[in-house]
Each structure stands twice: as structure tokens, then as C-alpha cells.
Amino acid sequence: MSWALLFNSLALALPVALATVTVGWLAALFIASSRGGAQLLALGGVIVSLALPPFLVVNVWLGLLGNVGVLKPWLPFDIYSHGGVVWVLTLMLWPLPCLMSLGALKRLTAEMLDAEPGLCGWPLVRSLLLPMTLPAVLQSGLIVFALAFNNIAVPAILQVKVFPAQFWVQFSTSYNFELTWQYGWAMAALPLALLFLLRGRAFAWPWESQGVQAEVLRNRLGQALLNLVSVAVCLFVALSVLLPLGHLLLDTRSWTDL
């Protein structure tokens, strides 16, 4: 077994988990403090982003930042790299922490806010919102870590050597089942450990509670924090949903190959 590839996969999954829980938490805060059309659009973007196939997301960024990408002359970022895989996986997986953090935020009540009427903005986040959502953040981070570690499609397309992709290539070319038992334990160990850690733990889902009214939460967050979460949501919905769908709909091959 290649320990170097195994550690490379672990080093890939960690930044993906950290990035997705950060973006997902900010997006959850935006949804919890929004109402009407803005809330529905954000939720729709979260769900669509989670449902998009990996090859569609990767193809968009290959067209933009690949060897002959449109933006390559102006943005010399190597998409065929460790950082490129982290970026694409972050765009694919941030909805999971968003939905789980939103469920935790939905448990916020007016009584909790009234207990500390002077808490607003960042002090409110630090003293109340982060502690009450921390279990959901940790749970979602572990799930994303396992998904990123075992992802095969994105690293394989971007030609980044990681343990699952290398294992799949070797097995698919030789159909060596002894190799499966010898190396496959590393891929199975992480999800099994995750199931063990999360056994018996309750997940807070967004539809289980109504939560505090959006107007009340918005007033307590303050304009600066609202602007930050709004920019984060708009940016990631645009990059992870509108960009892939726009590429799919505007590409003439999408219609000629039907």
C-alpha cells in the first residue's frame, strides 16, 4: 500500500472539510436570517449544488482554467493540482454543512436572544450561535472529510494522485480481488469510524423546527455581518450552481448530442 498516497488523500480531505464548514455555516446563517424569495432561492441553490454530477462541475473549471482555458492567460491557477481538487470538492460539498448548520440554527428561540439582549453582531455569533451549532459543524465536517477522502472522480479527472483513485485504477485494470482486501480497508475504515463516532447522535434538520423569526435575527446580527454572509452565499451559489448550469445550457453540444 502506498502510504504517500494515503497521506496525500488525508491532506486533501482536511482543507476541503475546513472550507466547506466555513462556507456552509455562513450560508446557513444567511438562510436563517432571510425570508421570502431570497430564502427560497438560497435553499434551491443549496439543493441543486448538492445534486450536480461531479463531471459537470469539473468540466466547467477545465474550460475556464485548463491548459487551453478561457481564463488561463489572466488567472494562472493550475487546476490540475492539489489546490484545484480542493476548490472543486469545496464547491460540490459545502451544501452538506449548510443544511446541518441550518437545522441547528432553527433551534434558536426568542427566549435565548432575550436572555442576552445586549449581544449583537460578532459577540452574538461568538457567544451563542457558534456554540449552539458546533455539534452540527463537527458532524458535517466529519462527513465531508470522509466524502472528500474517498472521492475518486474529481482527483482522477484532474490527474491528481490520491489513494482511492490509484486503487480504483489498479483494480479496474487487473480485477485483482486480493488487492481489494489488501488495500480497500483504508477506504472503508474512515466511513466505519465515522458511523461509530456518530452512532446514537441526533441530527438537527431544518424542517424540524421553525426557529426565531428572520427579522429578529437580522436585527441582532447587524448590517456588517449580514453583508458578509450575503456575499458568501451569492458567490458560492453563482460558482457552484449558475456557472455549471449556464455552461451546460449555453454549450451547443448539449443540444446537438441529444
Model-inferred region functions:
Residues 149-175:
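Glycine-rich helix-loop "coupling/hinge" segments at transmembrane-helix boundaries
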Residues 201-232:
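Flexible interhelical linker loops that connect adjacent transmembrane helices
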Residues 43, 66, 110-118, 127, ...:
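Short amphipathic alpha-helical coupling elements at transmembrane boundaries
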Residues 116, 179-180:
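Solenoid-repeat scaffolds in large eukaryotic assemblies
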Residues 1-106, 132-156, 180-199, 223-253, ...:
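Membrane-water interface segments at the C-terminal ends of transmembrane alpha-helices
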